Amino acid sequence: MQKAIRPYESPWTKTVPGNSIFLLKNEDKPSSSSSSLSWLTSGSPKPTSISNKRSSNLVVMENAVVVFARRGCCLGHVAKRLLLTHGVNPVVVEIGEEDNNNYDNIVSDKEKLPMMYIGGKLFGGLENLMAAHINGDLVPTLRQAGALWL
């Protein structure tokens, strides 16, 4: 039997829940689990806000494309699907209502979500992504950031 697929979930994207994004690098505390995907579990306690801000910067700097979006937002889903059609596997950071101050250094205005970081630099929101796609500037930008190889 096939497994049921939850809406807005794809096996080709890595969705990082807002509660546990900061466990990508287990530098602050040793991990008791030997699984390499232990940072995906939502039952992990939140580290302090100082390490939250430092680790959110690491997520942006270590990945070619990062999308910050509200949890369950259709605009974030559109941005993710557009990047997937270009062959890019973006890291999607879903920000919930409980994550009020954890992303202040990355997302300055929560009203303008979703926000994309390409190559460690702020690319803009969905409007900028769509404009670059229509103008033909998106593919060269993704190649320059290392998100596309061909």
From Swiss-Prot:
NAD in keyword set: no
Localization (cell): Cytoplasm; Nucleus
Motif Responsive for interaction with TGA factors mapped to chain: 147-150
Domain Glutaredoxin: 53-149
Region (Disordered): 30-52
PROSITE patterns according to UniProt: GLUTAREDOXIN_2 (PS51354)
Keywords, in A-Z order: 2Fe-2S, Cytoplasm, Iron, Iron-sulfur, Metal-binding, Nucleus, Redox-active center
Bias type Low complexity, positions: 31-44
A Gene Ontology term for the protein's cellular component: cytoplasm
Chief localization: cytoplasm
TM helices/strands, residue ranges: none
Residue numbers binding [2Fe-2S] cluster: C73
One Pfam family named in its UniProt record: Glutaredoxin
GO biological process, one term: negative regulation of transcription by RNA polymerase II
Family annotation (Gene3D superfamilies): Glutaredoxin (3.40.30.10)
InterPro entries: GlrX-like_pln_2, Glutaredoxin, Thioredoxin-like_sf
Molecular function in Gene Ontology: 2 iron, 2 sulfur cluster binding; metal ion binding
Record function comment: May only reduce GSH-thiol disulfides, but not protein disulfides.
Family: Belongs to the glutaredoxin family. CC-type subfamily.
Protein name per Swiss-Prot or TrEMBL: Monothiol glutaredoxin-S13
Organism this protein belongs to: Arabidopsis thaliana (Mouse-ear cress)
